[in-house]
Swiss-Prot record:
This is DNA-directed RNA polymerase II subunit rpb3. One of its GO terms (biological process) is transcription by RNA polymerase II. InterPro entries: DNA-dir_RNA_pol_insert, DNA-dir_RNA_pol_RpoA/D/Rpb3, RBP11-like, RNAP_Rpo3/Rpb3/RPAC1, RNApol_insert_sf, Rpo3/RPB3_RNA_Pol_subunit. It is found in: Nucleus. GO terms for cellular component: RNA polymerase II, core complex. GO terms for molecular function: DNA-directed RNA polymerase activity; protein dimerization activity. It comes from Dictyostelium discoideum. Component of the RNA polymerase II (Pol II) complex consisting of 12 subunits. The lineage of its organism: Eukaryota, Amoebozoa, Evosea, Eumycetozoa, Dictyostelia.
Length: 302
């Protein structure tokens, strides 16, 4: 029997497990691997941010040549919370650049002391208070948050103008807002309690300890003395528990399976965007792409 479009249509769901300042973990369910992979790729390569793309040097007598410093400046993540307010340079009506498509940053540092002077991302001064180096918005005085650019000795100086533009990761990796964007299938773990009961206390402890991510738990001092699944989401499919069970002559002690329509995503942000915003932008981009395809199909172009 043929299936209708409504029967084939899925309604993907997203469940957030954890949100931090620089990362998010969520479950994408009721969909297939093609959608999961599309979401991952868009988060890496098609969510726009602001990054330094042009550097004009006025003075530089440091140990690093202009190209080295320009490359380092381009890799400094800039806060891009207002990215929607900027347009791409190629789409802007200006002849060269303007406030609608770019942001100017200045770096002017001279070492006047006998000890070396560290030039860092905190020395970059932006003409737009909303587009600044990510390290500059850290309120603590911890210098480890600052990104080093170059060291100057007495008498050396560096003076330049940098232009930040809007772009995406598929043009250059510096525009990617994601440090990490990975997913794995949600595991299905089933324990054979009859087989587990045949193990000695020592064997139970050895079997539970064979899992490097501590999926299982067992305490011989508890009244039940049962092996339990503590957190199935920790499973990385290393199969160490299967190997240990086989060494005990009980290969059917545990059953592992991947749930094909449920994916656990881990996304870490460079700081340019909040991790939850990366996910939302990616979903919007995918929806826009699908809408464009629908429009072209309706016009008979596909």
């Amino acid at each position: 029997m043929s299936q209708t479009v409504s029967q084939l249509t899925r309604q993907p769901e997203l469940e957030i497990l954890e949100i931090k300042n620089d990362s998010i973990i969520f479950i994408l369910s009721n969909t297939d691997i093609s959608v999961a992979n599309a979401l991952r790729r868009v988060m890496i390569a098609e969510v726009p941010t602001m990054c330094i793309d042009l550097v004009e040097f006025e003075s530089n007598n440091s140990v690093l040549c202009d190209e080295f410093i320009a490359h380092r400046l381009g890799l400094i993540p800039l806060v891009s919370d207002n990215i929607d307010k900027f347009c791409y340079t190629r789409d802007c009506s200006c002849s060269d650049r303007c406030d609608q498509c770019s942001v100017e940053l200045r770096l002017n540092v001279k070492c006047t002391e006998n000890r070396p002077r560290d030039v860092t991302s905190s020395d970059l001064l932006s003409q737009n208070s909303a587009v600044i180096p990510v390290s500059s918005q850290v309120t603590s005085s911890n210098s480890e948050q600052e990104i080093p650019i170059v060291k100057l000795r007495r008498g050396q100086e560096i003076k330049l103008r940098a232009i930040a533009k809007k772009g995406v990761g598929k043009e250059h990796a510096k525009w990617s807002p994601s440090c990490v964007a990975t997913y794995q299938f949600q595991p299905i773990i089933v324990l054979n309690q009859n087989r587990i009961d045949e193990l000695t206390d020592q064997q139970k402890e050895e079997w539970v300890g064979s899992c490097p991510t501590k999926v299982y738990s067992y305490s011989p001092h508890q009244s039940t003395q049962q092996v339990t699944i503590e957190d199935p989401l920790r499973c990385v499919y290393c199969l160490e528990c299967k190997k240990k069970a086989e060494s005990f002559g009980k290969p059917d002690l545990v059953h592992l399976e991947q749930k094909q329509d449920k994916f656990i995503f881990t996304v870490e942000s460079s700081g340019a965007l909040k991790p939850e915003d990366i996910v939302l932008y990616a979903i919007q981009i995918i929806k826009r792409k699908l809408t464009d395809i629908q429009g072209q199909m309706a016009e008979g172009m596909l």
